[in-house]
């Protein structure tokens, strides 16, 4: 619910993930085969006190063959073959099956100890959408021991997901696939245990798929015909070891312009400024940390008249890993430590100070 729209609904979901992997290593090549089966199901109760509900269910089979061959010490070629079949059913559709096949080739060439490049092509075939031939290109050049410059260019394509198309009460079956062309240049400075990265990026998108909150309180996906994203990202990280004690600090800042080319206005709910910082202390299997996150103001109307204020949040946490070769992680967090009153969507107040206890098992 929201401040202006009351809600008495309930949402239940149940998901499973199962995967098998076979790996073969030889002198000049490696071969990996993965098979995964995923199930996703949800029930939505408009009235949580009623037994009446709508539902959606997707069962997906994923197959992948990853083959890597070393032509020489400086050249490798990597081929990827992917197959996905998803069967969906739900209250808003009888049955829907989507089959996707993908082939990719990636060439990597290390010209010297300082300079390398890579080239890739990718073709996706579906029974629903016509996909263009996609490409990627990248290079990395270490000008000095402390400074490396990197550049990447790629053409991308994304088809709407089942949730985009058929989510109960919110899906949009008329969505078009999203096309994009993006490039970035990164400058990486490193010294001992510290690193600073400055990245500039530019992305041109056609039919961008975005979920937008509507006046009735529901989020719905739509295409925005032409969008330009550009900006800067900065990252700094450092760490210091004293015996078995490890201290680490990471901070980042991003400035993003995401503009509708027709209106020349910033897209709704995309902040110009985002920043975060993380300070952590580790001793053997014990870790404690402090997190700080800042989100700048966002516009809530396409004419950029209405907006939500910026906010900053703090979290603290502690965890202990009981495993040695495996992960058995028990942790506790205090979220929104300062009890900040904020909204990241209009009329939807976010939780105040709250607590989280978690157990992570990696068998």
Roles of regions detected by a PLM:
Residues 18-24, 63-69, 105-109, 137-141, ...:
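Residues on the lipid-exposed face of transmembrane beta-strands in outer-membrane beta-barrel proteins
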Residues 3-25, 148, 152-206, 212-241, ...:
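Outer-membrane beta-barrel signature, preferentially recognizing the C-terminal barrel domain
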Residues 1-60:
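Flexible loop and strand-edge segments within Gram-negative outer membrane beta-barrel domains
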